[in-house]
Amino acid sequence: MKAKDLRQKSVQELKELLAKLREELRVLNTLYINKRPFNYGRRRQIKRDIARILTVLRERNEA
């Protein structure tokens, strides 16, 4: 997900997407802790997407 696309979304949409990604990350982290097979690349991408969303939300709060 690109930051440019995120900037076009409303704050409510960003918060909903953030909650969804955090839940997905929680599930992947559980698999990681239990040494189950999962997609490492997806885990990394989710963490980056969460960081991008938080960055966009902070930009809007400062503006």
From Swiss-Prot:
InterPro entries: Ribosomal_uL29, Ribosomal_uL29_sf. It holds the Pfam family Ribosomal_L29. One of its GO terms (cellular component) is ribonucleoprotein complex. Keywords: Ribonucleoprotein, Ribosomal protein. GO terms for molecular function: structural constituent of ribosome. GO terms for biological process: translation. Belongs to the universal ribosomal protein uL29 family. NCBIfam families: L29. This is Large ribosomal subunit protein uL29. It comes from Nanoarchaeum equitans (strain Kin4-M). The lineage of its organism: Archaea, Nanobdellota, Candidatus Nanoarchaeia, Nanoarchaeales, Nanoarchaeaceae.
